[in-house]
């Protein structure tokens, strides 16, 4: 498990540590010995219809929030937009396809 990509110096894409054997599939979603942040809240969402747009989440720099997003089944797009005024990457964006494979 490690960082495979960093976006805007703030957003990190991690490769989860997982294994498959005769018993099935196992993946570490969070390990405090690896990540440099803590988790205060956990949520699980289900989007049963293809093409569902879930929402836009915005946080002020003065009250940052760490989010750990993973896809258990299927795939989805996650978008990151730099809205920090004065940032050299202001208004730039990237998309990341998340899936059960990554």
Where are these regions (language model features)?
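Non-catalytic, conserved peripheral segments adjacent to functional cores
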Residues: 1-101
């Amino acid at each position: 498990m490690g960082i495979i990509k960093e976006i805007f110096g703030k957003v990190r894409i991690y490769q989860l540590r997982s294994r498959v054997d005769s018993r099935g599939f196992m993946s570490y979603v969070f390990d405090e010995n690896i990540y440099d942040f803590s988790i205060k809240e956990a949520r699980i969402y289900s989007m049963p219809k293809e093409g569902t747009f879930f929402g836009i989440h915005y946080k002020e720099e003065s009250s940052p929030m760490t989010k750990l997003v993973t896809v258990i089944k299927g795939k989805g797009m996650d978008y990151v937009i730099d809205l920090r005024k004065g940032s050299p990457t202001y208004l730039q964006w990237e998309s990341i396809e998340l899936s059960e494979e990554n």
